[in-house]
Regions:
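C-terminal alpha-helix plus adjacent terminal tail
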Residues: 1, 95-100, 120, 124-127, ...
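Glycine- (often His-adjacent) and acidic-residue-rich active-site loop
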Residues: 1-19, 38, 66-68, 151
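Short, surface-exposed, polar/charged, turn-prone segments marking secondary-structure boundaries
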Residues: 8-9, 60-61, 80-83, 88-91, ...
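Short linear sequence motifs
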Residues: 12, 83-84, 149, 175
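Hydrophobic alpha-helical segments typical of transmembrane helices
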Residues: 15-19, 74-78, 87, 139, ...
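Crotonase-fold acyl-CoA enzyme core
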Residues: 21-134
Length: 183
């Protein structure tokens, strides 16, 4: 619909990029629920979420090669970050599809469940997350998003500093209460 309208295409690309950045940087936990199809640009939204639950029979793929185009708009980068190099090359170059179970095996999704159970599973996980301290979840999300690109020493320093910042910012002393309940 935007092929012959560069302004509309730019607007759509900007909106998609803004949305994926919002998902990735949100202080709240985000859950993607995949039921049906996940192709091309949908991988960007999916990768921006913290948890991905898919129907085991959902269909995933990078079909761009079949249409004579590149998986652009950061789709190639996102897909290459999600899966190992061999899988990235295979699926990007063949345009083949794969199911939800394979998406879990490749690290794209967290969990695959029967389609009839998908909504209930996502709601159950959302409720579980709602029982956690929001500030702790936000700090955990930030930490997990950042430490992957750090070496061990840098990660240690970052996490120690992040932990101190959390303790200072947490008016409910979630750590203290959690430790006393654990012990």
């Amino acid at each position: 619909a935007t092929d012959n309208d560069p302004a509309a295409r730019f607007k759509a690309q900007w909106a998609h990029r803004h949305w994926t950045q919002f998902l990735a940087t949100s202080q709240k936990a985000t859950i993607a629920m995949v039921n049906g199809y996940c192709f091309g640009g949908a991988f960007c939204s999916l990768a921006a979420c913290d948890i991905v639950i898919t129907a085991d029979d959902a269909t995933f793929g990078l079909s761009e090669v079949n249409w004579g185009i590149l998986p652009g708009g950061n789709v190639s980068k996102v897909f290459a970050d999600l899966v190992n190099h061999r899988n990235a090359m295979f699926y990007a170059m063949t345009g083949r599809t794969f199911d939800g179970a394979k998406a879990v095996e490749m690290g794209i999704a967290t969990l695959a469940v029967p389609a009839d159970d998908l909504r209930d599973e996502v709601v159950s996980i959302a409720r579980e997350l709602m029982e956690k301290a929001p500030m702790v979840l936000a700090y955990t999300k930030q930490a997990m998003r950042n430490v992957g690109d750090m070496d061990m020493n840098m990660a240690y320093e970052y996490l120690a500093t992040k932990g101190m910042a959390l303790r200072a910012a947490d008016p409910k002393d979630t750590r203290g209460r959690g430790m006393s309940e654990f012990l």
